[in-house]
A protein has these predicted regions:
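Early extracytoplasmic/lumenal segment of secretory-pathway proteins
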Residues: 17-85, 211
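Extracytoplasmic ligand-binding site segments that recognize negatively charged/polar headgroups
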Residues: 72-73, 77-200, 205-217
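Mature extracytoplasmic/periplasmic domains
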Residues: 257-316
Length: 340
């Protein structure tokens, strides 16, 4: 009897030792970018646990990854200029495209961008543009330019993205300068322009600027196109306009941090997201510009016929990406403190 009991105990012990740990992936992404149902469906389909956390700016992303223990994050979604910064800091793994059966679904026009020639370290996930949203219930004037926002009638009516590069870049564009200028005299003019705008500013908000429009707390906003699209869906009085001076562009990308612990699982997750039907759900939930050419074929007319969600090619050609300006960022930092 004792021998039998010992054998049972040994068998149970060995079973416990051979039990495999559940696979998991640690994802760090922008808020709202991937609906919860997509994550849950991936977990059900694969048995892989997704630990999902968010950030609200590229700088916050950089700080989180820099300060975390090596291997903390497996997949991140930096924007264009941040990809370049992280490449220069040796913070990203090379992307092995041969592990992605859905790589060919990506639209070539969003590949091989200046911040990562050859897509050695990143792959496009979503594209975006800034845009002006106007609630026509309250604003009857024609608005075609950033300079129209200076109208004193709009006191406490304007919401801006809480992003110094985008908003100082907007002021530079409004004055006919390059959005990434580091010329001190041009930056001083941009600063004075923003100080003129100050009385009109209701709030700076990067998380949900559309909420101010939908709730009618503000009548005008400079925001990203997905937020503008949702505002229009919620309230048909909200009109979206691309300013004549040009816009800020952004591409958010899949990227694998250096020393990521679960890289094979990362490729499974990226491939899942690149499935046309999965990308359709993501795009139509949070309507940024789609970069998946197979998804283009199945998108709804609601998405395709909205100029805010489906950014026209001519707008993309005219727009500018935020560029890495090195230590000159201190010039922007000082202006940001002064105008806020």
């Amino acid at each position: 009897m004792k021998k039998i009991i010992i054998l049972i105990i040994l068998t149970l012990s060995l079973t416990g030792c051979t039990k495999t740990k559940k696979e998991q992936i640690n994802v760090l992404n922008w808020s709202s970018y991937i609906p919860d149902e997509i994550i849950l469906d991936f977990e059900k389909e694969t048995g892989i646990k997704v630990n999902y956390s968010t950030y609200s700016s590229n700088e916050e992303l950089l700080a989180k990854v820099s300060n975390a223990k090596k291997g903390t994050y497996d997949l991140i979604f930096p924007s264009d200029y941040m990809i370049k910064i992280m490449i220069n800091k040796n913070m990203l793994e090379n992307i092995d495209k041969t592990k992605l059966k859905n790589y060919s679904n990506l639209n070539e026009k969003y590949l091989n961008q200046p911040y990562d020639k050859g897509n050695k370290y990143s792959l496009p996930f979503l594209a975006a543009s800034t845009i002006i949203s106007i609630n026509r219930e309250f604003i009857k004037d024609e608005i075609t330019s950033y300079n129209d926002l200076l109208n004193t009638k709009y006191k406490n009516e304007v919401v801006l993205i809480d992003d110094e590069r985008i908003i100082i870049g907007m002021a530079l564009l409004a004055n006919g300068f390059d959005m990434n200028s580091v010329e001190k005299n041009e930056l001083e003019i941009a600063k004075e322009w923003l100080l003129k705008l100050k009385d009109n500013i209701k709030a700076y908000d990067s998380d949900s600027p559309k909420s101010f429009l939908i709730s009618k707390e503000a009548s005008i906003a400079v925001l990203w196109n997905a937020e503008a699209t949702i505002a229009n869906w919620e309230n048909k009085n909200i009109e979206n306009v691309y300013p004549k001076e040009g816009v800020a562009l952004s591409i958010d990308n899949f990227a694998i941090p250096k020393d990521a612990q679960n890289q094979e699982i990362v490729y499974k997750f990226i491939d899942y997201i690149l499935e046309p039907t999965i990308m359709k759900k993501i795009i139509e939930s949070y309507p940024y510009k789609n970069v998946n050419k197979e998804t283009d074929k199945i998108l709804s007319n609601k998405y395709k016929n909205n100029i805010a969600s489906n950014i026209p090619d001519y707008i993309f050609r005219k727009g500018d990406f935020v560029e890495n300006i090195g230590n000159n960022i201190k010039l922007y930092d000082k202006i940001w403190v002064d105008i806020k």
